[in-house]
From Swiss-Prot:
Resulting phenotype, H190A: Loss of plasmanylethanolamine desaturase activity
Impact after mutating H213A: No effect on plasmanylethanolamine desaturase activity
Signal peptide: none
Subcellular location: Endoplasmic reticulum membrane
One Pfam family here: Lipid_desat
Main subcellular location of this protein, as a coarse class: endoplasmic reticulum
Lineage: Eukaryota, Metazoa, Chordata, Craniata, Vertebrata
Source organism of the structure: Homo sapiens
Transmembrane stretches, start-end: 47-67, 74-94, 161-181
Name of this chain's protein: Plasmanylethanolamine desaturase 1
Length: 270
């Protein structure tokens, strides 16, 4: 089994009694409670999502390969790069939203989708103990609709129409692939031993999120470097204060404090 790092980021500013009781990692009271909320129903949803998603990926990939033409190569390369960039931004937007707003107590989305983000900040190594289904189930669910739409086009459009759409569909497919594997890439960024050589090379070349790069996010209060697909956009977004400005705007409009629920779980001691 691949090894993982064992660091929590900087300690939160708790009073002395709380700090003495609080333990980071799997033994943290909040981490144990959040892990216990992972239900059989959630597991079933993940299994169904993964099976459907990868079936559609295989179907669509075969059709894209059959339609491939050399003259489309420049546009396909451009689409691959654009897909990776947009997937990185979307990963940051979702990550920032789930980290910063909402609550585990929210109906439906709380336990199903926000819970893993709260657990991850308390126990960053938990993701390395998740199997392929738990790691990728939610992302597979999100990409089902665009995959179904693409499959529908391949089944209903004429070959001539598909040739015209080919560069666009390659862009969409690349965006879907990066989106589907974002949490797997995220898991690899927390795994420090036993990764396949090809994964570490992609990390070293910064094709996917590097391990050291992602550690910046895991410094409490987890308010920066949210993009977790390639990580390409983290520095420029931080440089212009994108997330901070967005948080200030939302707080000004709603009065809600960023990361209030995240901090509540981090401070839980029993």
């Amino acid at each position: 089994m691949a090894g993982a790092e064992n660091w929590p980021g900087q300690q939160l500013e708790l009073d002395e009694d709380e700090a003495s009781c609080c333990r980071w990692g799997a033994q943290h009271a909040g981490a144990r409670e959040l892990a216990a909320l992972y239900s059989p129903g959630k597991r079933l949803q993940e299994w169904c999502s993964v099976i459907l998603c990868f079936s559609l990926i295989a179907h669509n990939l075969v059709h894209l390969l059959l339609l491939a033409r050399w003259e489309d190569t420049p546009l396909v390369i451009l689409g691959v790069v654009a897909g990776a960039l947009i997937a990185d931004f979307l990963s940051g937007l979702v990550h920032w939203g789930a980290d910063t707003w909402g609550s585990v107590e929210l109906p439906i989305v709380g336990k199903a989708f926000i819970r893993p983000f709260r657990e991850h900040h308390i126990d960053p190594t938990a993701i390395t103990r998740h199997d392929f289904i738990e790691t990728n189930g939610d992302n597979c669910l999100v990409t089902l609709l665009p995959l179904l739409n693409m499959a529908y086009k391949f089944r209903t459009h004429s070959p001539e129409a598909l040739e015209q759409l080919y560069p666009w569909e390659c862009f969409v497919f690349c965006l879907i692939i990066f989106g589907t594997f974002t949490n797997q890439i995220h898991k690899w960024s927390h795994t420090y031993f036993g990764l396949p050589r090809w994964v570490t090379l992609l990390q070293d070349w910064h094709v996917i999120l590097p391990r050291k790069h992602h550690r910046i996010h895991h410094v409490s209060p987890h308010e920066t470097y949210f993009c977790i697909t390639t990580g390409w956009l983290n520095y420029p977004l931080e440089k212009i204060g994108f997330w901070r400005r967005l948080e200030d705007l939302i707080q000004g409009l709603t009065g809600e404090k960023p990361r209030a629920d995240d901090m509540k779980w981090a401070q839980k001691i029993k």
